Amino acid sequence: MTRPRYVLVTAAYNEERHIADTLRSVASQSVLPHRWVIVSDGSTDRTDDIVIEWAKRHPFIELLRVQRSAEHSFSAKVRALRQGFARVADLEYDFIGVLDADISFEPDYFQRLLEHFSNEPRLGIAGGNIQQLVDGVVIPRIKDLSSVAGAVQFLRRECFEQTGGLPALRYGGEDAAMEITARMHGWRTQTFPELK
């Protein structure tokens, strides 16, 4: 049996303080993505340069530069992500992840996440527990385990295609809207708190 393939899409705007940690975290995974498209949404800091350096050493990383929308709303990020989704649309993959540019996780994160999907055929959207580092202290952001934080949503391709991806909503809530649509199609959504 072949190992499932996954792709990641990240929207990044002026993330030079965090993007290297995220790149390191993904590049250290026990199961690497088939492709990771990082959409630089008009970054004016060193974000693009940092991604380019990592892409030289890791061919699965691709930088996609786009013009930043003049409109400043939650939907600007969704527009950037949609351009990344279009970039991977013709690739062969089984899962797609939406990953924020300031996230780090354990080296077996995606391996363990894929195991959950393998064991649960109706699992449509899943992710791990989000923790925030504040003044050197790790603070868990516990939420309803039947919901998944938008920063780490990982979807079965069939579920992603049925939901139509992230809707552009002016005042936010795109991740929740995608989850609700997934549930309406009979998919389960789940946060696995042991995944960090």
Give the ranges of each region predicted by the language model:
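N-proximal low-complexity "stem/linker" segments adjacent to membrane-targeting elements
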Residues: 1-28
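Cell-envelope/extracellular polymer assembly enzymes that use nucleotide-activated donors
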Residues: 5-7, 35, 177
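Acidic donor-binding segment of Leloir-type glycosyltransferases
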Residues: 24-70
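Active-site nucleotide-sugar/metal-binding loop of Leloir-type enzymes
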Residues: 78-95
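Short beta-strand-to-loop acidic/aromatic patch adjacent to the donor-nucleotide binding site
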Residues: 92-104
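Conserved donor NDP-sugar-binding/catalytic core segment of glycosyltransferases
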Residues: 104-139
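Conserved nucleotide-sugar donor-binding
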Residues: 149-164
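Acidic donor-binding loop at a coil-to-helix junction in glycosyltransferase catalytic cores
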Residues: 171-178
